[in-house]
Amino acid sequence: VTAPDRTIWWDAPATTAAALAVLRLTDGDVDAGRVAAHVDPAGQIINQRLDRDPVDAYTTATVPAEVAAAHVTVVVNLYRAKDQPAASIDGMMLGAVPPSYVDPLAGARALIDPHRTRRGIG
């Protein structure tokens, strides 16, 4: 069984620009670098979900539009989760604010799943 593809198929500057547009930020904003830092991790999260064989790796020219759109969504989700508190024992105490969990693939699964290949089966 081969490991899922980890190829970098995305265009980082284009993905960053699209995510900044969704967030209504510009290249000059303080958080622009933070948004850009989420591009590669978001792509690898999508690679894991796609579970593609490395032989079927996408290139920047062959990536489906839905997968590229999902990539922007995951980048935005990761950016929006930046200020969330980590889960802690305090979340279990009476009167404490419970920790929340942001699913980075929320809103992106419907775009990604039609392009999955092995579906976790070796």
PLM regions: where:
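Divalent metal-cofactor coordination and adjacent catalytic microenvironments
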Residues: 1-122
